[in-house]
């Protein structure tokens, strides 16, 4: 029945209470990613996300995604980026796109392609405005990506890095040393006072995600939220 299908879909898309880690949490991305292997899928997803949050009262958003995660059925990273920009054009929300490189094994070439696309499409506003590094932080440490971000700096690309979520404060220090002006999550800076000071002194913006931090067990108790 339709009800039954809806329940099953909800289950596939919802992080269970039994979720124990970021790696567990990331499994919920499998189905949405599968639906975004075409330009129509990506364009529609960007448009729907933007419209949805606009109706909730959000006045500005930076929608981020990893173009390399959408190439399984023959779409190129560049076509994925163009599709996202198409979706962005259709919304009334003031929004930009951030392109994510991914932590992982054997995808170095794909990350450099994302970097080159960020450079090609980079604008001040109304399109691609920066780059990010996302994915399984505990398995693939920030320290592996020095050369990638050296190149981003050389190109003058602004970037943020997911750090201090599944790995400790050292990951945040590393990201800041690479030149990240913002940190995705950063909740574990509280484990090291010197990293807290570094964040404060350099005016690093922390992009906080309290809901997912509870779901991934990056924070057990909201009293401990930095």
At which residue positions do the language-model features occur?
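Glycine-rich anion/phosphate-binding loops
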Residues: 34-47, 78
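Histidine/acidic residue-rich metal-binding segments in metalloenzymes
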Residues: 81-90, 96, 109-130, 139-161, ...
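Polyampholytic, low-complexity intrinsically disordered segments
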Residues: 12-39, 131
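Divalent metal-dependent hydrolysis catalytic cores, especially in the metallo-beta-lactamase
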Residues: 24-34, 50-73, 94-100
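Hydrophobic residues within beta-strands of alpha/beta enzymes
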Residues: 61-63, 131, 183
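Short, small-residue-biased leader/transition segments that mark boundaries at the very start
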Residues: 3-5
């Amino acid at each position: 029945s339709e009800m039954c299908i809806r329940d099953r879909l909800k289950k596939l898309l919802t992080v269970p209470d039994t979720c124990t880690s970021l790696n567990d949490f990331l499994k919920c991305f499998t189905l949405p990613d599968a639906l975004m292997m075409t330009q129509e899928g990506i364009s529609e997803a960007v448009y729907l996300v933007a419209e949805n949050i606009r109706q909730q009262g959000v006045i500005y958003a930076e929608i981020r995604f990893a173009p390399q995660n959408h190439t399984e059925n023959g779409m190129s990273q560049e076509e994925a980026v163009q599709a996202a920009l198409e979706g962005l054009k259709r919304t009334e929300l003031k929004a930009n796109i951030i392109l994510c490189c991914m932590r992982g094994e054997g995808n170095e070439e794909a990350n450099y392609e994302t970097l080159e696309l960020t450079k090609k499409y980079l604008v001040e506003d109304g399109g691609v405005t920066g780059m990010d590094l996302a994915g399984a932080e505990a398995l693939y440490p920030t320290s592996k990506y020095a050369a990638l971000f050296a190149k981003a700096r050389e190109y003058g690309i602004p970037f943020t890095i997911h750090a201090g979520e599944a790995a400790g404060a050292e990951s945040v220090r590393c990201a800041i040393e690479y030149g990240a002006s913002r940190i995705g999550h950063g909740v574990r800076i509280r484990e090291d006072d010197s990293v807290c000071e570094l964040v404060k002194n350099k005016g690093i913006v922390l992009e906080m995600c309290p809901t997912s931090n509870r779901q991934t067990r990056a924070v057990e108790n909201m009293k401990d939220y930095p």
